[in-house]
């Protein structure tokens, strides 16, 4: 069995997690109390979903997941919510005081009191697996817990489970919408360890997803629930081939192999199509070619970043539903002929495709229409550097005046860590620049950085 353990850290991680597990349960016909009525056996008794759920003796299905937060309110919502019986109480770990938007509190003072408990629980889940494949880590880098405790946990996971792959789903600060003043600090400090300790990191940003909800679903004032349900569809599409059977299954380690050309260049853009409301869906025939084109639209990207400003290094297209390989090949062929979608000259093929026959499930009363087929694209594009340069610029403005730095130093950080993290990100921006540069003559000096 190739199990995956999900780790949800901080408010963003937990709320995205709630949306994901709600969707997984619907997809597999698992009730909120973890029972799976035998008449609803998905896929004729195929147990592929055991990659995400473990079955107890009593026939209850328990998510292989841990929820961690430094303060109790968000986790208490899980403890009292619809799915309270789904999780073992030990899987929900909460502290008493929060990280107060401070990376140093999440990483040093308060985080380190709880991290051993988390690792203990993760170890229990890991011992319950026959062939642990890797970890899916959900967090945001703008706050204190997601960034600080998130980095700390990733560092410790690297020590304890060196070879296991770690996929990050990371919410980055948006260009216009900000939830805290010190976001740039937390993001830079946290990305510093994401660079080292995740194998693939998928960037999400609230503003981009707000825009998709407004534009494609005509929701005037999207809530976090709207956003998270959209994100959960992306994550469900990525993990569908671990949980169902299909024609072209894609493993977690396969993402890594196909998307990451150099170890540091592992920050991905994601997009999903069709994002369409029920009213419109009746009037549209969403062919494979249409949804594929739509996935490449800059407006479909779930991070504010324009792929036309950079070049693609690799793409992973995960189709689900009524899709056959012939259609996929035709659609990809069309994309390759488009001049607007540019690939780097050293990566001529650039496409990895997966097909899964399970059509996308929608949450009842949700915003998305039930469709026959959908595609999720994860792409590695040099334009991701935009996201980092934006944060770096804001970081520099604040750090030049050493604004707010005393809060971090007071929690046991050293100023040197700021400049070290900032230099690391400057190097990352440069790496992206070099990777996108034309020509094959500068390949020899690539060696110093790795």
Curated annotation (Swiss-Prot):
What are the EC numbers?
A: 3.6.5.-
Which Gene Ontology BP terms does the record give?
microtubule-based process
The reaction(s) annotated as catalysed by this protein in its Swiss-Prot or TrEMBL entry are:
GTP + H2O = GDP + phosphate + H(+)
Modified residue annotations for Phosphothreonine: 349
Share what the entry says about its subunit structure, partners included: Dimer of alpha and beta chains. A typical microtubule is a hollow water-filled tube with an outer diameter of 25 nm and an inner diameter of 15 nM. Alpha-beta heterodimers associate head-to-tail to form protofilaments running lengthwise along the microtubule wall with the beta-tubulin subunit facing the microtubule plus end conferring a structural polarity. Microtubules usually have 13 protofilaments but different protofilament numbers can be found in some organisms and specialized cells.
Natural source organism: Arabidopsis thaliana
Q: Name one GO molecular function term.
A: GTP binding
Q: What does this protein do?
A: Tubulin is the major constituent of microtubules, a cylinder consisting of laterally associated linear protofilaments composed of alpha- and beta-tubulin heterodimers. Microtubules grow by the addition of GTP-tubulin dimers to the microtubule end, where a stabilizing cap forms. Below the cap, tubulin dimers are in GDP-bound state, owing to GTPase activity of alpha-tubulin.
Give positions of region: Disordered: 430-450
Residues of the active site: 254
Q: Name one GO cellular component term.
A: microtubule
Changes after translation: Undergoes a tyrosination/detyrosination cycle, the cyclic removal and re-addition of a C-terminal tyrosine residue by the enzymes tubulin tyrosine carboxypeptidase (TTCP) and tubulin tyrosine ligase (TTL), respectively. Acetylation of alpha chains at Lys-40 stabilizes microtubules and affects affinity and processivity of microtubule motors. This modification has a role in multiple cellular functions, ranging from cell motility, cell cycle progression or cell differentiation to intracellular trafficking and signaling.
For this entry, the protein name equals: Tubulin alpha-2 chain
Q: List the disulfide bonds.
A: none
Describe the family membership recorded for this protein in Swiss-Prot or TrEMBL: Belongs to the tubulin family.
Residues noted as binding GTP in the record, renumbered to the chain: 11, 71, 144-145, 179, 206, 228
